[in-house]
Amino acid sequence: MKTAVIDVGSNSVRYAIMDENTTLAHKKLNSTVLSDGLFFSGKLSDDAISRTVSAIAAYCEEAVKDGAEEIFVFATEAVRSASNGAKFCKRVHKACGVEVDVLTGEEEAEIGFLGATACVKNECAVFDLGGASCEIIRGKNGVIDFSHSFPIGCIRLRDGAGGNKEKARELINSAFESMTIPRVNTLIGIGGTATSLGAMLSCPNKYDPKVTHGTKVDKRFLEGVISDFFGGTDMRLKYPCLTPNRANVIGYGAAVCLRVLEKTGAESFTVSERDNIEGYYEFIRNKNR
């Protein structure tokens, strides 16, 4: 049975058709920047809601054409923390006829770990950096022993720092200071920031998920990205693989990734193209068993 899974993130809406935990086609993405302005207002803007609902509706139509028998839509930190998150969910239901599953921070962390570590047997940690939050999870053989959602993401950081490198560092340190994160040897990065950084290293001219998967991103590279970004480098010119919206925030994302490496003691992270979409599919399968 084919199942469509739609991930409503803070920066983008993603779509994939799943069948027995196998992605049948490349994931598709529409960058709607749902969390734009959320840092200042505490709510989702009307324009961002309209862009995102339209993207979800288009993917629901595509799911029907692709032969999906079920369509699942889940949302993360932007909808979870917005004062008008319920309004957004009602708009989606009215336009598409589907319910939005707004995940808790713990559920968001769990599905990211499930997706990224399906083939990993040793102890490892996974971090999922989005537009409005960063989840860090550690475990082994599918058993999680540490999980926390931190209120820092590349869009939220952009809005809060306003282009100031030192202010960005202060906000990152503040977000992580309240929690001691376990040290790890193996760290896996998922989400748009991680995969974009992987592409910048492995296929800078054109993004290719088959190439980025498994790429190792180290501290030195992250420091270079941060220096370029805040130094005024045209990131799209240097890295054509980046979309305009991603190029506008990649320096903030790299700064958060660097702090994650410092907090966990890891020297690098490995990019995974398996992420919360695969994890959510496994999550709902487990609930229905």
Where are each of the predicted segments found?
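Short linear Ser/Thr-Pro motifs
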Residues: 10-12, 133, 272
